[in-house]
């Protein structure tokens, strides 16, 4: 099976500081991959390269076997859903308007998207009666569910999630983790998740990519990283997470 997203020798620097060393990485359709590692290790940079919010200095980013270029970047973004930590909701728009914004942006008939909105409310467990509330009138968990619906509105082939649960309290976070896992399974969604949390990565992802200082240290299942660490950093990272949990 051909990868849906592929990076070939991709690197990126910021003001002379290397954010991502030359990297080869492929993402298979229907799988959830977690990018995990300390702050500044290149996880979010990698996501922004995939969705063409950043451009590589060297190497190629491929989507569906085609190079991502300035000429086709808008089309690539239409086929990708993007969810960030704080959601990026517009405070002056209702939940409904925030979700339907993607339809308008890409020229879809909003009236035809109402059925899709109903489906997403059920899928994300968002109460329909709250659709006409503004973000300030919603809880943190509800706001993030609105952001998730917006990311899924156009039935994206790939869903990118950049620390989507990091700002939520533990109980809300746990509930959303369960819902995300169910959504990934029901939609057979190709998803790339950025997180600091090894437990979250192990729960949600089919495979984990551990990064450090702009490089991939190890790729495998949670059991691979735990039982067969490829580098001392892998064990250090996992042990630090265990210590922080108590």
Question: How would you name each of these model-derived features?
Answer:
Residues 134-138, 142:
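Conserved ABC ATPase signature
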Residues 219-220, 228:
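ABC ATPase "signature
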Residues 59-67, 76:
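Conserved ABC transporter NBD signature motif
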């Amino acid at each position: 099976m051909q990868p849906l997203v592929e990076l070939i020798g991709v690197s990126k620097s910021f003001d002379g500081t290397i954010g991502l060393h030359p990297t080869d990485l492929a993402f298979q359709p229907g799988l959830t991959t977690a990018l995990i590692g300390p702050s500044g290790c290149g996880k979010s940079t990698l996501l922004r390269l995939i969705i063409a919010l950043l451009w590589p200095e060297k190497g190629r980013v491929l989507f569906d076997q085609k190079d991502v270029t300035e000429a086709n970047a808008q089309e690539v973004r239409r086929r990708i859903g993007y969810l960030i930590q704080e959601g990026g909701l517009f405070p002056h728009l209702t939940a409904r308007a925030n979700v339907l914004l993607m339809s308008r942006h890409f020229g879809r008939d909003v009236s035809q998207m109402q059925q899709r909105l109903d489906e997403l409310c059920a899928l994300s467990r968002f109460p329909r009666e709250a659709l006409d509330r503004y973000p300030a009138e919603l809880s943190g968990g509800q706001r993030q569910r609105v952001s998730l619906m917006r990311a899924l509105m156009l039935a994206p082939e790939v869903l990118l999630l950049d620390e989507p649960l990091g700002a939520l309290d533990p109980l809300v976070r746990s509930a959303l983790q369960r819902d995300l896992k169910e959504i990934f399974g029901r939609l057979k969604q190709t998803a790339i998740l950025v997180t600091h949390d090894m437990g979250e990565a192990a729960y949600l992802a089919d495979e984990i990519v551990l990064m450090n200082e702009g490089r991939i240290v190890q790729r495998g299942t949670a059991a691979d990283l735990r039982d067969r660490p490829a580098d001392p950093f892998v064990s250090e990272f996992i042990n630090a997470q265990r210590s922080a949990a108590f």
